[in-house]
Regions:
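Short coil/loop residues immediately preceding or within conserved phosphate-binding loops
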Residues: 51, 302, 324, 371, ...
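Conserved, well-ordered alpha-helix/loop/beta-strand core segments that scaffold catalytic motifs
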Residues: 285-325
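Membrane-proximal periplasmic segments of bacterial cell-envelope enzymes
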Residues: 1-288, 295, 321-326, 332, ...
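Glycine-biased, low-complexity coil/linker segments
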Residues: 568-574
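Solvent-exposed, polar/charged alpha-helical surfaces in well-ordered, non-transmembrane soluble domains
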Residues: 71, 115-119, 123, 171, ...
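Beta-lactam-recognizing serine transpeptidase/beta-lactamase-like catalytic domain environment
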Residues: 65, 71, 95, 282-297, ...
């Protein structure tokens, strides 16, 4: 009997050992590669290597935008939860019971060492403890939520891995705050500081609509960027697909900054360069990090603008305090923008981390629209400045000469009583006028007559020849194209040829064009809207004798650009470089130029 019991016990022990041996064999031989990969994943960190963003300078080399050293605060949850009296919570954080992961509150005990760390940090950062706890909870909940999609055997490992990653919770620490955290790891367990680069707009709001601003990647657009391959364009081409995918999986680009408007946006690729990658192993016991491999970054490009700093200052001073307005100074021969401003302005430094949420909301939602670049995005009826196009059309069509007279008694005709000259408001008249006199007095009646002779078709055609109704192609994002009316086929000629027709029968509609529409357009009113930049371009073409230049804001790239496409956003449009396919209009554009100079309207 005793011997039988011994045999049973020995057999039972043998079975246990056999099971253990089989399990060890499975771990060390069959699943060796799987666990080796997993172990390496948990111990390996992949980090982006980024160069400071390229500078932006004016045409004379004055630095407008550079970079300054900044500090970000990161937390490594695994190290944070290992602080002293948290062992019950530490083990709880790694539970994989599906019913428990959503219910455990690791911050309920405000007497724990974790809460003491949070209190110290809140005091240092001058924020509420709840603000930090909320950020920590968000990280924790996201990890637990993601773990639920993993197979049961991988969940615990996944949570451990994610807890060993670093997560940014604050940007824009002062040097004193950064030194305090780094100098006392025992007081701020799990938290560390990383140097980063923040944009520095030296002259605050100066040229803000040209330069634009940078900002973080929004949560709602991150997945879209991944899907469209934006981040692949931001890496050194030598970095392989596996490393890129690992970066995507770990959210390696979520802390990246990119251009949000202006030059910062349209030339984001040049200003950013291309990221490199550093792969290292981190020992959680010793907290030592050993570099395994490195692929260097590709340096960014500095960009020189065409604007002149002193001229820009003077233009912005003229617009200071205005609720709305725009101004542009252009080289009429080259198309270089020497100054461009829009009012009201904004300070892009206020949109850099740490971002004041109230200030951001004010800037983005203010009814004054300070982010709106009225110089290239504002669309308005051009008014009297469009009279130059009317004159050009009438001259080019051979309907008038510079000396053709029209008589202004204050009104166009008895049938069109509402079409009157501004001087009629003062019970006066201009009398007989030449083209030069008409420009001097900005006489509506003269241009009503010139427009009627030229016809709506000719005026709209020459408006398009002068660049209206299309983007100029300036190398800044956000340009609008305005609108030039489209005439029904043959309708204008028909209506304009009818003499003595009652104005009630000439009302415009979607399918008809009336003489009243031609009259309105002749003085820059009606269904015609343009941007300030289009007006400046038109005036430049008349001033230089007929060449329609393409406005540009980039003078040169200081460094040889690398073969990189910018992070795709809104690309500059294409603009024509000539009037109606011909670079010079002779003699009409020159005639209008001479008349305007003589009249004093182009001086």
């Amino acid at each position: 009997m005793f011997q039988k019991r011994v045999v049973v016990i020995v057999g039972f022990i043998a079975i246990i050992f056999f099971v253990i041996i089989i399990r060890l064999f499975a771990l060390q031989v069959i699943n060796n590669s799987y666990y080796r990969i997993q172990a390496r994943k948990y111990a390996t960190r992949i980090e982006l290597i980024a160069d400071p963003r390229g500078k932006i300078l004016d045409r004379n080399g004055n630095v407008l935008v550079t970079n300054r050293l900044a500090f970000d605060l990161f937390v490594t949850p695994a190290l944070y939860f290992k602080s002293k009296s948290n062992k019950p919570k530490s083990s709880a954080t790694l539970q994989v019971n599906p019913t428990a992961t959503k219910e455990v509150d690791y911050f309920a005990d405000q007497d724990s060492d974790q809460w003491e760390i949070i209190r110290r940090l809140a005091n240092l950062m001058k924020v509420k403890t709840d603000d930090i706890a909320s950020k920590m909870k968000t990280i924790q909940q996201k990890i637990l939520s993601q773990s639920e999609t993993k197979p049961e055997r991988e969940r615990k490992r996944f949570i451990k891995q994610q807890y060993r990653n670093r997560y940014k919770i604050f940007s824009g620490l002062t040097l004193a705050q950064a030194v305090q955290v780094e100098s006392h790891p025992e007081l701020f367990a799990g938290f560390n500081v990383a140097e980063t680069i923040s944009r520095n707009y030296i002259y605050n709001d100066l040229a803000c609509h040209i330069i634009g601003y940078t900002g973080p990647i929004w949560k709602e657009e991150y997945d879209q960027f991944v899907e469209n391959g934006y981040f692949d364009d931001m890496l050194n081409p030598e970095i392989d697909e596996n490393t890129y995918q690992a970066l995507i999986d770990m959210g390696g680009f979520k802390n990246a900054f990119l251009g949000r408007s202006g030059i910062e946006k349209i030339h984001n690729g040049l200003l950013t360069g291309r990221y490199g990658v550093r792969m290292s192993e981190f020992d959680f016991a010793t907290k030592q990090k050993d570099e395994l491999s490195r692929t260097e970054s590709i340096p960014p490009t500095d960009i020189m603008l065409t604007i002149d700093l002193d001229l820009q200052k003077k233009l912005e001073a003229a617009l200071k305090g205005k609720s709305a307005g725009a101004g542009i100074v252009i080289d009429v021969h080259t198309g270089e923008i020497l100054a461009m401003a829009s009012a009201p302005s904004f300070n892009p430094n206020l949109l850099q981390p740490p971002v004041d949420s109230q200030m951001t909301e004010f800037i983005s939602k203010s009814p004054l629209k300070p982010l709106y670049n009225r110089a290239i995005s504002g669309e308005y009826p051009p008014g009297s400045v469009f009279k130059m196009v009317t004159a050009l059309a009438a001259l080019e069509e051979g309907k008038i000469t510079a000396y053709t007279p029209f008589y202004c008694n204050g009104h166009f005709s008895p049938q069109y009583k509402k079409f009157k000259c501004w001087i009629a408001e003062h019970n006066r008249e201009h009398g007989s006028l030449s083209l030069e006199d008409a420009f001097k007095g900005s006489c509506n009646v003269y241009f009503y007559n010139a427009g009627k002779l030229a016809g709506g078709d000719a005026i709209t055609r020459w408006a398009r020849n002068m660049g209206f109704g299309e983007r100029t192609g300036i190398d800044v994002s956000g340009e609008k194209k305005g609108r030039v009316p489209k005439l029904p086929v043959d309708n204008d000629a028909l209506v304009a040829s009818i003499s003595g027709t009652n104005s009630a029968n000439l009302k415009t509609s979607k399918s008809t064009w009336a003489l009243s529409d031609t009259l309105n357009m002749s003085i820059g009113q009606g269904d015609l809207i343009v941007t300030p930049l289009q007006i400046v371009r038109m005036v430049a073409a008349i001033a230089n004798g007929g060449t329609l230049v393409r406005p540009r804001i980039i003078k040169s790239n200081i460094h040889t650009p690398h073969p990189s496409s910018p992070l795709r956003g809104e690309e500059p449009g294409e603009g024509d470089n000539s009037l109606g396919g011909s670079a010079v209009l002779i003699p009409s554009a020159q005639a209008v130029t001479k008349v305007n100079i003589s009249a004093g309207t182009l001086t």
